[in-house]
């Protein structure tokens, strides 16, 4: 049984599906009862932000799959991600019997955040920081649930792409990483799951427009994760909760990425 921590990034529509969340946290609860491997969740919550922007009559703009975040909007986005989404997930975990702690990228200096691109506004890039506090939390039997909101060196709120945040968190903890989303992994031109991809193979599929839009960010984050962590990482789906225990144990149920 591996004792290397496993970082699980939750994405897609899972945050809006109570039934799936219940099954996910039930699977985590059952796994933690019999395994000693520390688990940690990283999440975004784009749909919550989209809904909030509509209610506030603010336009949502994306550049290459990344949300443009004007400084005037970051308080609302941080509230949706570090507030509503994080506490909703924590509540679902507690309901399923999982002892959960809600955190952000800033807590304990887990990640260091710098501005990604001035054209994107308050959007940050996360680098691995100090994982000591989060490691202590996991060692005490808690499941950290980490939002993709961080603080830069000036204490300014920054919105970080959740896939990229998960990479930095995994690097800070020397952990393995799974990106869980509403897709099974990367599909070929005929809709069949590709079980493994190298960087060159992935870039070829991007050039061929087999991999498009937001999936480009996800795939490149996966490749960067494999490089940064020095180990393959996996993109898989949360749609089949009965497979999650196998995933937690390191079995491949999606697309596994390697740097070479």
Curated annotation (Swiss-Prot):
Lipoprotein found in the keyword field: no
Site positions for Transition state stabilizer: 9, 218
Binding site for substrate: 45-46, 67, 159
Compartments reported by the entry: Cytoplasm
Keyword Kinase: yes
Protein family per UniProt: Belongs to the acetylglutamate kinase family. ArgB subfamily.
Name listed for the protein in its UniProt record: Acetylglutamate kinase
Native source organism of the sequence: Photobacterium profundum (strain SS9)
Gene: argB
């Amino acid at each position: 049984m591996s004792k290397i921590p496993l970082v699980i990034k939750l994405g897609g529509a899972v945050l809006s599906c109570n039934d799936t969340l219940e099954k996910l946290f039930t699977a985590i609860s059952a796994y933690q009862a019999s395994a000693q491997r520390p688990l940690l969740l990283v999440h975004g919550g784009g749909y919550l932000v989209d809904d909030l922007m509509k209610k506030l009559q603010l336009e949502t703009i994306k550049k290459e799959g990344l949300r443009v975040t004007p400084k005037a909007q970051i308080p609302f986005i941080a509230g949706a991600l570090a507030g509503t989404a994080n506490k909703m997930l924590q509540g679902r975990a507690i309901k399923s019997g999982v002892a959960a702690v809600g955190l952000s990228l800033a807590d304990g200096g887990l990640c260091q955040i710098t501005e990604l691109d001035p054209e994107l506004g308050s959007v940050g890039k996360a680098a691995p920081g100090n994982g000591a506090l989060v490691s202590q939390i996991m060692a005490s039997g808690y499941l950290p649930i980490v939002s993709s909101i961080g603080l830069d060196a000036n204490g300014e709120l920054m919105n970080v792409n959740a896939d990229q945040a998960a990479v930095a968190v995994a690097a800070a903890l020397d952990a393995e990483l799974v990106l869980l989303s509403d897709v099974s992994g990367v599909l070929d031109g005929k809709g069949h799951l590709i079980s493994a991809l190298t960087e060159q193979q992935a870039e070829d599929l991007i050039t061929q427009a087999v991999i498009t839009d937001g999936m480009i960010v996800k795939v490149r984050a996966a490749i960067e994760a494999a490089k940064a962590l020095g180990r393959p990482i996996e993109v898989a789906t949360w749609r089949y909760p009965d497979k999650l225990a196998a995933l937690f144990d390191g079995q491949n149920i999606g697309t596994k990425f390697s740097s070479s």
